């Protein structure tokens, strides 16, 4: 059975790079009817944040990426790690190192002066003498001193690292707490991981973890190291570019399905297809198809995808989602008409909410540039005649087509172009030159509100 995992540290919020890695892992598990596990790597007690941990869990809930089984917390597994440290000590595969910080710094300076690679020199590897007084030892694992540490990375290909490139690294600090590469290898092995998908910033942790796997007799999983996400200029993605908390995307009005669709295409493709439902992602995703090169973040692409998913949402779903953005139209008698008129105009739920507010709230002032363009020449006379026509119209005025007929009549009677009524009418009803179609707006707000808004606008025209 395929078993994958995502293992964030609750020292900060979940960013989109992490979410993409989690998505690739989740899709791999779901594609193979396997398990996707979630592990919280909370061993850094000084930097851990309960708020960050909760935000990570909320982000997973928001995007709908469910995990299997209970969340594993490393902070609750210290006794387990100690058991394996003791085992390695007893088997002679690890040892106590009494080297002080001062000695280690002196060694590094000496190596740097000789232009050698800085590394621990193994001086306590076979030490049998009397330990120095007053020094709390660290525990180091015995790394192989010759040969090659090899593995095949599913993205990068064959990786061969000379054994002497990996020194006897620390697996337990002087206070007894275990180190990152040690606990990650143990957890991945005990959780039954078959495939480890992670950012390629972890690529050079892998040889150390393989040393731990081999020392403890664990099976080595398949590794996939995914290239980073860059900004549009090909440089490291920053918060300004979009490397922000996943939940910030929710606050900005992005839909989870749009964000997942966007992220799956950052480093993976399936022909020329751009739009993927979650079901299609699960069906088609294979980690072997992950690109070797870094992907560039493109906000316009994300906005395009988000607009697509908004447009294809049912009106009832959109009405529910809009409540979080200060717009409750769930009981509005023109809900369908209102959303049909606006949902193709909003690239985010925030924009959609603003479009709806623009229609439902009478303008208290008018855009200055729009006024100069629209409220000139015959505008006052045309609007006044339009009010009179609405007041004396004998047919029902309910649908956009009904109001369009009134507009057609005034255009015909006054022998003017549609722009002569359209522009001043738009500014009168919405306060600006942008927004939904005028016939739709009038049908939504009704004839009385339409007349009231036009009269208010006419009173401001000199």
Swiss-Prot record:
The UniProt GO MF terms for this protein read: ATP binding; glutamate-tRNA ligase activity; tRNA binding; zinc ion binding
The source organism is: Sulfurovum sp. (strain NBC37-1)
One matching Pfam family is Anticodon_2
Q: Where in the cell is it found?
A: Cytoplasm
Q: Which domain of life is it from?
A: Bacteria
Q: Which CDD domains match?
A: GluRS_core
Q: Which family does it belong to?
A: Belongs to the class-I aminoacyl-tRNA synthetase family. Glutamate--tRNA ligase type 1 subfamily.
Q: Where is this motif: 'KMSKS' region?
A: 236-240
The record's listing under HAMAP family reads:
Glu_tRNA_synth_type1
In the record, biological process GO terms are: glutamyl-tRNA aminoacylation
- Which parts of the sequence form the motif 'HIGH' region? 8-18
The subunit field of the Swiss-Prot or TrEMBL record says: Monomer.
Name of the top EC class for this enzyme: ligase
The name this protein carries in UniProt is Glutamate--tRNA ligase 1
